[in-house]
Amino acid sequence: MSDSENHESSEPGSPARSGRSRRKRKSGGTRNAQYWMVVSSPDNFRKTREHGFSIQGLKSRHRRRVETMRVGDRLLYYVTGRMGFAATVTVASPMYEDHTPIWRSSRRDEDYPWRVHIRADFVLDEADWVPAKELAYRLDYVRKWPPEHWTLAFQGHIHALPRADFSVIEDEISRSSRRRKTLAV
């Protein structure tokens, strides 16, 4: 192989061999955590709870998103039907593929194959879930939709959230958790 076949062109502005331009990674290889919202049915949230909040599977069509998840990323759970925020967790492993049935979908062939191990941060009892309606007006993410259609922000399965929005929701989940502990004393 000649040198020209071995190395990509080093001239500024020249395209990479694949025809796509390539971005250089910042040295150090670290990045800030990403923040995600998992939209889950009550049954699938229950399945995650039954597994001790140790694993989360995501739908097959979301492989690219899940591939960007890293250890230390944060997930929060929005539960449909109840329209409430129920828990926050931290991603504890890189993505892997597993077709063992745990979660259910209306699509018969969906087995949530893209999985990450997780570690629970805050988990609320169902009676303490934080209603999304109470927080929606405070979330930048929700402002993409007209106010009368705020619930559209919670359609789909996995969404990237701004850190500030995640913090607003997690603070309310934490407050709800502390309220429950105070009432129990």
What is the predicted role of each segment?
Residues S2-V71, D165-V168, I173-V185:
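Compositionally biased, charged N-terminal/linker segments
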